[in-house]
Amino acid sequence: MKRQKRDRLERAHQRGYQAGIAGRSKEMCPYQTLNQRSQWLGGWREAMADRVVMA
């Protein structure tokens, strides 16, 4: 059960990262639950930081 939960949160983080790299707005987050949303936003923020470094 814990592994499945962690995988779901990891997937949310990865999708947030991909959205950030693509330049999408953080308001585009598809998740409603707090944990998944925070993971998605964490990935999005990480991608935005990486975009600044790469530019």
Curated annotation (Swiss-Prot):
Its main location: cytoplasm. Pfam families: RMF. Transmembrane segments: none annotated. Induction: Induced during stationary growth phase. Requires ppGpp for translation. During stationary phase, converts 70S ribosomes to an immature dimeric form (90S ribosomes) which are converted to inactive 100S ribosomes (a process called ribosomal hibernation) by the hibernation promoting factor HPF. Inactivates ribosomes by covering the peptidyl transferase (PTase) center of the 23S rRNA and the entrance of peptide exit tunnel. However crystallization with T.thermophilus 70S ribosomes shows it binds near the 3'-end of the 16S rRNA near the anti-Shine-Dalgarno sequence, where it would sterically hinder translation initiation. Belongs to the ribosome modulation factor family. This is Ribosome modulation factor. The gene is rmf.
